[in-house]
Amino acid sequence: ERVPIYPDTLAWVHDFTYNFNEPMFDKYFWHPAYDEYPVVGVSWKQAKAFCHWRTAYKLYHLPEERRVFETEYRLPTEAEWEWAARGGRELAMFPWGGPYSRNVKGCFLANFKPLRGNYWADGYIYTAPADAYIENDYGLYNMAGNVAEWTETAFDPMSDIFASDLNLSLIHISEPTRPLRI
């Protein structure tokens, strides 16, 4: 099966039909200012295809004697993703360990909205750069908020029924029954 290699560059337009003049829609995928931002608009199949491509690319550039020791790239399982997101903190609510979403200065510790429709409160109306917030104890950034990640396995049988006030229908998701980690 052929899988398109490029993300859905109209990912946000599906929900905001009349916002074609919004610079984010036009520039996010192509402008160098967004090089360190997360990839969005990618289906589960596209994420899997990228893993396959990345494995082949790496193996192609390795000497023959090292190829047997290399593992393939793949999506993490939900359990692996959660383990990485927690950063070694077993009982913590957030990857940074504390029960609070703001630091002592009142600044948000992740890219998420505190109230329905309040997208500016964390400093970013859409996504945030990959290193915009403090990393967890494993050195991973944005493991709470920002964008959703695809996983190989599902967390819950109902994980395909995800809704938010940004997108109530998810009609444009090409693989709605695949695991999605929020």
Functional labels for PLM-detected ranges:
Residues 4-170, 174, 178:
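Functional-site microenvironments in short loops/helix caps that host divalent-cation chemistry
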